[in-house]
């Protein structure tokens, strides 16, 4: 994964307004929660979050699964059942793939 620079982000159409949008959302959220003081704090927080997100390099270990880049990807053309069986996983597949469970 390649990290974009601020110059690259700003060169995208509308990219320069990203920080302004983040600050506006923060201001509106803060105002909703705590009135005028919340609006001021929310705007500052929105800008700080944008600055952090635009310069931060993602850490694969912080992925939702907690496994990051340690999981091998299934090669193309191999059925999921065969891939999981070869890896020693016993999987129960649901028809709509919403509640698949692998042990």
Curated annotation (Swiss-Prot):
Superkingdom of origin organism: Bacteria
Intracellular or extracellular location(s): Secreted
GO CC annotation: extracellular region
Keywords: Antibiotic, Antimicrobial, Bacteriocin, Disulfide bond, Plasmid, Secreted
Disulphide bond pairs: 91-102
Pfam family, one: MccV
BP terms from Gene Ontology: defense response to bacterium; killing of cells of another organism
Propeptide residues, chain positions: 1-15
General function of this protein: Colicin V kills sensitive cells by disrupting the membrane potential. Colicins are polypeptide toxins produced by, and active against E.coli and closely related bacteria.
Listed name of the protein: Colicin-V
Organism, scientific name: Escherichia coli
């Amino acid at each position: 994964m390649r990290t974009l620079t601020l110059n690259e982000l700003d060169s995208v159409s509308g990219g320069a307004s990203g920080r302004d949008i983040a600050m506006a959302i923060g201001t509106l959220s803060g105002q909703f929660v705590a009135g005028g003081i919340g609006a001021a704090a929310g705007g500052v927080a929105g800008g700080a979050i944008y600055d952090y997100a635009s310069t931060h390099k993602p850490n694969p270990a912080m992925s939702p699964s907690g496994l990051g880049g340690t999981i091998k990807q299934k090669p193309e053309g191999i059925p999921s059942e065969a891939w999981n069986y070869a890896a020693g996983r016993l999987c129960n597949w649901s028809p709509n793939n919403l509640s698949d469970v692998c042990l």
